[in-house]
Amino acid sequence: MAIVKIINSPRSQNLKGLHGVLAYCCRDAKTTHEGRKLITGINCVPQIALQEFMNTKRLHGQTGGRMYYHMVQSFPPEETITPESAHEIAVKLAASIPGFEIVVATHRDAHHVHSHFVINSVSFETGKKYHS
């Protein structure tokens, strides 16, 4: 059974932190499996997510405070799951959070398969901040 954790980081308060978490989560070496990149954007394009997140914040006057939420969904090492299946589950979970731009990136490089979620702290629909 998968578990989901919120990763609290002081870096979530600034643009440099947002850039860093997106770069880390989307690295080819961690997300490529059998020639396929396990990266999906929910309400955004992963390659330009930083710009899209910031455009949403500027549009709604929400450029201060927390920039993003970083969550990780992981499976125990003894659970047999393919990276593709883990990614599909992660994308479904992310899609259940309406109104937010989310990058989902599944890593297959550790002892267990896990997926990262980088969620814009501001809703593109309402302009309000996400509260976990």
Where are these regions (language model features)?
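N-terminal nicking endonuclease/strand-transfer module with a His-rich metal-binding environment
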Residues: 1-132
